[in-house]
Amino acid sequence: MDVSRYLRLAMLAVLTGLAACAGEVPPEQPAFYRSMASADAEVDGPTAASMISGYRHNNGLGAVEVDPDLMRLAQEWARSMAARDKLDRGASRDFNKSLAGAGFNAKKTVENISAGYHTLAEAFSGWRDSPPHRANMLNAGANRMGIAAVYAPQSKYKVYWALIMATKDSS
């Protein structure tokens, strides 16, 4: 075999290898590991509901469903905390009034707030490891939820979280 044939085969092998590399798309990061530390980041509600429902199932409780009204209220709450650069329940003072105004009649509501966690996985782990937050996620009657994270780049914590879980009053 002559040298030019070896060179052609070697070049073909290199090009085939490069083409294979160019065709590979890196796998997308799971939603619970996506950073919320960007202005366009949004919590994936169904992923959060699945994660919380799985945790509840492991503790003998029923699943929760994403509720659009609770998602909107959680977003407003997280946005309010981020705007004030303050982690507090002040935004929830008229919480039941806000729920009723949104057409959501609740028998009971519980909420978790936090700041500084950059991913859903971190926020969930923090809540799971905190007895009062854990109790809220394991509230026996809860059947609906809303969750949000808001990025505030100039703030102390950068990302503010709000989770609202409720028992919808069907009467």
Predicted regions and their residues:
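Extracytoplasmic
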Residues: 43, 61, 69, 108-110, ...
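Conserved beta-strand positions that form and line the central face of beta-propeller blades
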Residues: 63, 112, 164
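Bacterial Sec signal peptide processing site at the extreme N-terminus
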Residues: 15-39
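Disulfide-stabilized extracellular recognition modules
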Residues: 119-171
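Short, surface-exposed glycine/acidic/tryptophan-bearing loops
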Residues: 71-118
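Sec-dependent bacterial lipoprotein signal peptides
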Residues: 1-19
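Post-signal-peptide N-terminal segment of Sec-exported extracytoplasmic proteins
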Residues: 27, 36-84, 97
